């Protein structure tokens, strides 16, 4: 999701926890959570190993915190993007947001899907965060399709969720046109 976060300098003004999360965000999203070792995060954050353990305990908690921060940012960005949109039009407007995200220069697909695909532990704390975010999206789609007055809002919401998944995955592989295609299909679904 588009991340609107100020670039933070490596200064004492920025807390070490934030520097660690900023570094993890850049590296994990770009390269993956398994490809990036703790030493790279520490070097990028200009932080000591003890700081990582003090703030996160272990890499798994850093990964979970990275995803948690991404979900909080995504929700805030989506809500801000849709704030002036009537509820009945939010489902379609959401796909405009997806198109803008897919067209952004740093787009690399869904951080949730990428991270979860790398996790072998079913009990990893990041999995619960990813699941909660997907539930949040599902609930938004149900709200938006109900407000849009479609014949079967629950089924339409599920279909829009599948379109969203396909738009993000397809845009990563084929380019942002897949997000535009998904928006076109969403308009058809919502029109009945």
Where are these regions (language model features)?
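Hydrophobic alpha-helical connector segments
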Residues: 65, 78-108, 147, 157-160
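Amphipathic alpha-helical segments enriched in hydrophobic/aromatic and basic residues
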Residues: 28, 37-38, 49, 59, ...
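An amphipathic alpha-helix signature
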Residues: 21, 92, 135-142, 183, ...
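Amphipathic alpha-helical segments used for helix-helix packing
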Residues: 104-125
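Hydrophobic/aromatic-rich alpha-helical bundle segments in the mid-to-C-terminal region
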Residues: 125-132, 146-190
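Basic, helix-initiating cap at the start of DNA-binding domains
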Residues: 1-31, 35-47, 61
């Amino acid at each position: 999701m588009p991340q609107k976060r100020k670039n933070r300098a490596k200064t004492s003004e920025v807390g070490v926890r934030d520097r660690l999360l900023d570094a993890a965000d850049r590296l994990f999203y770009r390269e993956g959570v398994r490809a990036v070792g703790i030493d790279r995060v520490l070097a990028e954050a200009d932080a000591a190993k003890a700081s990582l353990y003090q703030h996160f305990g272990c890499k798994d908690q850093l990964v979970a915190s990275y995803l948690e921060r991404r979900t909080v940012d995504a929700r805030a960005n989506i809500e801000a993007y849709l704030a002036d949109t009537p509820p009945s039009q939010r489902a379609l407007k959401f796909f405009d947001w997806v198109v803008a995200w897919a067209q952004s220069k740093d787009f690399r697909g869904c951080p949730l899907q990428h991270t979860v695909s790398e996790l072998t532990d079913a009990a990893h704390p990041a999995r619960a965060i990813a699941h909660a975010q997907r539930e949040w999206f599902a609930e938004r789609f149900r709200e938006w399709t109900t407000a849009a007055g479609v014949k079967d809002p629950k089924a339409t919401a599920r279909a829009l969720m599948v379109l969203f998944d396909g738009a993000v995955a397809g845009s990563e592989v084929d380019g942002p046109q897949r997000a535009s295609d998904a928006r076109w299909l969403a308009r058809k679904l919502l029109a009945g």
